[in-house]
Amino acid sequence: MLRLRETQLKVLRYFHKFVGNNVLFVAPTGWGKTLVILSALREEGLFPALWLIRSLSIGYRVLEDCVKLGLNCFISAGRRRTCPLVLSGEVDEELIEDYCRKYRFQCRYFIKTFQIKVPKNISTYKILLEGVGNEHFCPYYMQDLISCDVMVQNYFRARRGFYKVVVVDECHNIFMPRMCRMDVDGLNDAILIIREFEEKLAGKILRLKRYIEEVGEGNIYLTQFLSLLDIQRIRQMIFLLENFKGSVARNFKRFIRIINSDIQYVEKGRIIGIRASQITFPTPTIMLTGTWFNIMDKFLPPSFKKIRVDVPENQRLNAVIVDDLTTRYDDFDYKMIQEYKKFIMQLKLKAGDKRILVFGTDRVLQYFTDLADFYEPQNIPKDWRGVMMLKARGRYSEGVDIPADIVVILGCPFYPPDIISRLSKIYSKMGFEDSWSLAATIPMLITTLQCIGRAKRSPKQKPNIVLADQRFQKYKDHLSPYLLFN
């Protein structure tokens, strides 16, 4: 029989007290948040429950805890992983969402889904895929017909069905703007596609590309080149791309996402689209995370009840702040770059054979890649040694385990000043009073802690933390619940 620890039972009693309310639950990684919430849902009969996650790897952890409690759990996935047309190569994965919206009611797999019995006692979408060959149904839509206690799915997958409660895992992500990137040269693919349908509009995109290349770095304003009608026509072209596949279709989809973004920005040959966070909460909602700063409380509705389990002092990571370095835009000049290089080389020399994991923004890391033994590797070697450099907001910034002896945050990972300014104005129009914190401070702090967390997936892992930017001094109070400053 599964037994909860005394501290878990204490938190469980709070959940019973707050049943029916919106709840924020903050506890350290590895504490057992998932198990406690599932226990509370079971005892209160709050099933079916919808459990929202960022990555499928987290979903399997939820499934494991459901099994321990005797609960039925199902992990659902998006069209790219479940559509038979994608898996057979008939439709490119980049186009499947739009293809499905247009042809769904003519699709033989979709129609067959509602003509067969719904499978029972299955736990993941992978099991559904095994039956497609015999029954010819659509696993994507079959997922929504599955009866279970806990339905696990991605934040951004459409929410169908009735649920008594919504659980938002790693809820700090709702404060992070969504980003889409593409190389400036990728606009050539967009021009190629648009020229197939409208030569004049393709000419506008060509002029836009030349403008972006001239700007080099900074804000770009698409409305200077494209009218609202132009943008609408480009969006509609996505339904006409059946003959395009691979990188051409991928770049065109990215271009549309960038068009749909609130902010467009160009940096180092890449176009970045940023969409401001849509901070909304259905009721009742349970939000859980191991990354939360008190400054974030002000953005929660008053209806939320907060349950917090602090990181014990003996489990906080030792940290130092390097006072004579900064990546602040006005100060990050040739001289400062040389000082950072000296710092990295001295650290590497002093550390010897230890593993040094360095995180930084694209703008910063580009000057130091020659000092790295590994830079954004395709796969993380198990027994790596030396210096590994990873992008602070790259594919390895969250959701992976990278054991290290030292973690270096190479500069405060703020967004560029122009982006912060525009994001702040957007949040202000949404009605948020402290819009600057929402645009600048909170994303920077979350990114910092998430990078550190890649080397701290269990209480046994205790890397030393080096915050290589004097500006971190200003945020010591925010970080002190997680770090011990020497």
Feature-to-residue mapping (PLM):
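Conserved strand-helix element at the start of the C-terminal RecA-like helicase core
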Residues: 49, 56, 347-369
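A contiguous, basic/glycine-rich beta-loop/short-helix subdomain that forms a polymer-engagement track
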Residues: 128-148, 159-161, 227-319, 373-379, ...
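Conserved interdomain hinge at the start of the Helicase C-terminal
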Residues: 322-357
